[in-house]
Amino acid sequence: MGETGVYARVVGKKVGEGKTKIVALRADMDALGMEDLKNCEYSSQNPGFCHACGHDGHTATLLAAARILKSMENDFAGEVRFFFQQAEEIGQGARQFVAAGLLEGVDRIYGQHVTNTLNVGQVGVVAGPLNASCDFFRIEVKGKGAHVSMPHKGVDALYVASQIVVAVQSIVARSTDPMESAVVGIGKAWAGTQYNIVAEEAVLEGTVRTFLPEVREATNRRLTDIVEKTAEMLGAKASIVIKNYSNPLINDADATKEAKLVAQEIVGAENIITDYPKSMMAEDFADYLPHCKGTFVYFGTHSDKPGTDRPNHNGFFDIDEEGLLVACNMFVRYALYVLGTK
């Protein structure tokens, strides 16, 4: 599926009454372009790349769940689809599964993610908004080169870009309802060719994160306006390209209620975190949810084991693999619950 994704399914052999159901289970697989700083037997073997977000754990967990459900195919009616999904980190993988028609007929889709904010044995189950949308933007500023000793003869694209960086901070501070959530961040900037030349070009790259469609639209519109007007005011030209990387992840109430019931059987009601905080980090599992009911939960992998307190996308990131047992159980039991086999 796509470049590196894998799709599989198990069809139950038990004869069901009436229409049988289909449930999809999803695990993301992609690694990150960063160095693994851990020194252990499972450290990355590929310089410059590593699993620092737990996707290897997700993949292992879904593989185990697939094996278990395959061994139980005589005990249930219906179908389980397994989505081993690529390209979550760039927000493109889920869309490829959707475009291939793999959600057709699916009654529920379930996904999950490791988190070091919960201890092993805890599960975060929340209905409604959980993860923000993600829009990527690239701003190109065109000025006019000159010798730095004669700045009046040029248009400094670097200076213009710096003013844009400052100006866009007003979007959240002064153009967004303070009761709503939004982030406008610029994480990459480059300009110029030499220390003594007025920069003729500058490039900025960043992201917009929101939960509500109307806030997302207004933020991107205001961002575009600030970029173009700031450049014009300072005698330069600027263009902006905005790409939709991921929609906001909003868990379906029914699917989440089912996941909560399943989690209670596995870890007990006292270990279910129903007030798990929303995150401005994006998750492209969201792109499945307009097409069928589904839910996404977080399972704890923090313990006394060194490294399990490190955040995602950190070179020392690690997990306590005991948490994967809970996740595997969640995959299997959620599928069986939806199919009517507890």
How would you label these PLM feature ranges?
Residues 11, 27, 84-86, 113, ...:
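Active-site-proximal beta-strand/loop segments in catalytic clefts of secreted hydrolases
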Residues 16-19, 75-76, 103-104, 289-291:
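Extracellular/periplasmic catalytic domains that process cell-envelope and extracellular macromolecules
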Residues 20-24, 79:
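Residues that mark the start of a beta-strand
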Residues 6-7, 32-34, 38-50, 56-57, ...:
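Histidine/acidic-residue-rich, glycine-tolerant segments that coordinate divalent metal ions
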